[in-house]
Amino acid sequence: MGMRMMFTLFLLVVLTTTVVSFPSDSASDGRDDEAKDERSDMYKSKRNGRCCHPACGKHFSCGR
């Protein structure tokens, strides 16, 4: 295999990986809206004393 063929194969793999990763990135944006929102699980837990997030779980009960 020549250098030109190996470089072409490398570019093909890089471009394929980039194209495949775009749809998964845009699909996850909608699912992360709650995590980006101020009224997420950690924010609500401060008002009612419950938290299921590992960062505040040692200070509050999960309530599940």
Swiss-Prot record:
Keyword Manganese part of the UniProt annotation: no
Cleaved propeptide residues: 22-47
Compositionally biased residues, Basic and acidic residues: 28-44
The keyword Ubl conjugation appears for this protein: no
GO CC field: extracellular region; host cell postsynaptic membrane
Function: Alpha-conotoxins act on postsynaptic membranes, they bind to the nicotinic acetylcholine receptors (nAChR) and thus inhibit them.
Protein name: Alpha-conotoxin-like Ac1.1b
Organism: Conus achatinus (Little frog cone)
